Amino acid sequence: MEYRDPGHPHFPFTIGIEEEYQIIDPETRELKSYITQILDEGQLILREQMKPEMHQSIVEVGTHVCRTVEEARAEIIRLRGAIGSLAASKGLRIAAAGTHPFSSWQKQDIYPHERYYGVIEEMQEAARRLLIFGMHVHIGMPDNETCIEIMNVARYFLPHLLALSTSSPFWMGRKTGFQSYRSIIFTNFPRTGIPDTFQSYAEFEQYINILLKTHSIDNGKKVWWDARPHPMFGTLEVRICDIATKVDEAIMIAGLVQAIFVKIYSLFRQNQTFRVYSRALINENKWRAARYGMGGKLIDFGRREELSAHDLMAELREFVDDVVDDLGSRAAVDYIDQVLKHGTSAERQLRTYEETGDIKAVVDQLIRETMEGVPLDQATQVVSG
């Protein structure tokens, strides 16, 4: 079955990952608005794989199209190595977390580009304070109709992915009480959150065209749902996750997303169905995932009862179990065991803060974990070559 075989020439469910890193001053541990000083040099190395974001203390990278999670792992290691080494050559560091533990959005410079000036003009304070860092996973689709059908079903699993990825418990020096405060901040933007269901791709296009005609948006990329059909790449893009701190965590998430989509498609091919739940119900789980992460309970809508996030994660693994070997992603998905044992990034950050009482120690931990598994000799080689 070509749709479950990454080695098949027509395998559709390819992987692409975007990550947004923090640029850190290692002396103060504050964010550093420095992208303009390293962008030209970085793009000589990475070309279009490195981009600025609205705030100059953010650097965005994107992998090439990958067929397997192990290809994606090599790409993420290469990109983190390149950006990390480039930052180090300027006396800086990078870190991966959904928010910075204490830096203020009010002290960040905006990247000088009309696109970002336009966003700020429209969104005002909601845009200026959008100092958050995400991970987006793109999965290739066989066709547009299949993309919509998979999105309708996969919406149910978005809170599961958020709970696993939580890495933003702090905001401007305060414990927020949330495991993903990033997801709370992003709700200030329009056209965010769990997407609605669509009966067809034509209905989705009609929605986009209404927004364009009424000047609500000027392009389809300004629909920022937690999952969306990408307007240019032909992918289904999952946007709900905080950026993963460790490489292993990023690959775990990417492997899960790919496996979920392939399993849903497999059910379609066998004329089987999976119930499509309302946005109102899924939003209940999203809020719980943001608030409690893997330490709380989510709702099993089929049973109509609460289950621990750990138990629902076991159900998710059982759901994708018959496709992960074909996809070569069992080891990546099994990393969930390590997250359950040692905690999510958010849980580890909070534990470090509780043990040390020093929020700068949290930044140091994030810097270390971001580059964990990235060989320094490889990082240097990428930058110099």
UniProtKB/Swiss-Prot annotation:
GO molecular function annotations of the record: ATP binding; glutamate-cysteine ligase activity
GO biological process terms held by the UniProt record: modified amino acid biosynthetic process
Catalytic function, reaction form: L-cysteine + L-glutamate + ATP = gamma-L-glutamyl-L-cysteine + ADP + phosphate + H(+)
Keyword Nucleotide-binding: yes
InterPro entries assigned to the protein according to its UniProt record, in alphabetical order: GCL_type2/YbdK_subfam (IPR050141), GCS2 (IPR006336), Gln_synth/guanido_kin_cat_dom (IPR014746), YbdK (IPR011793)
EC number(s) on file: 6.3.2.2
Keyword terms, alphabetized: ATP-binding, Ligase, Nucleotide-binding
Signal peptide: none
Entry function: ATP-dependent carboxylate-amine ligase which exhibits weak glutamate--cysteine ligase activity.
Xref: PANTHER family: GLUTAMATE--CYSTEINE LIGASE 2-RELATED
Family: Belongs to the glutamate--cysteine ligase type 2 family. YbdK subfamily.
NCBIfam families: gshA_cyan_rel, PRK13515.1
Record protein name field: Putative glutamate--cysteine ligase 2
Organism for this UniProt entry: Herpetosiphon aurantiacus (strain ATCC 23779 / DSM 785 / 114-95)
